[in-house]
């Protein structure tokens, strides 16, 4: 169950970073790293 939850967290983080990338391409990679790091800390 933890793997499934962690997978969902990663997918959500990627979706958020993708939307952020659509709004601002120049900061897409930076916001992606921050989002993933926050997701890992939360899990």
UniProtKB/Swiss-Prot annotation:
Disulfide pairs here are none
User: Which intervals of the chain form a coiled coil?
Assistant: none
| Marked site positions, Cleavage | 37-38
Q: Do the record's keywords include Signal?
A: yes
State the Gene Ontology BP annotations: latency-replication decision
Record key words, sorted: Latency-replication decision, Secreted, Signal
What does UniProt give as the signal peptide span? 1-30
Give the record's GO CC terms: extracellular region
UniProt protein name? Protein AimP
- Give the gene that encodes this protein: aimP
């Amino acid at each position: 169950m933890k793997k499934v939850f962690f997978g969902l967290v990663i997918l959500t983080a990627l979706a958020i970073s993708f939307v952020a990338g659509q709004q601002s391409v120049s900061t897409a990679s930076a916001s992606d790293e921050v989002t993933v790091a926050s997701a890992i800390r939360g899990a």
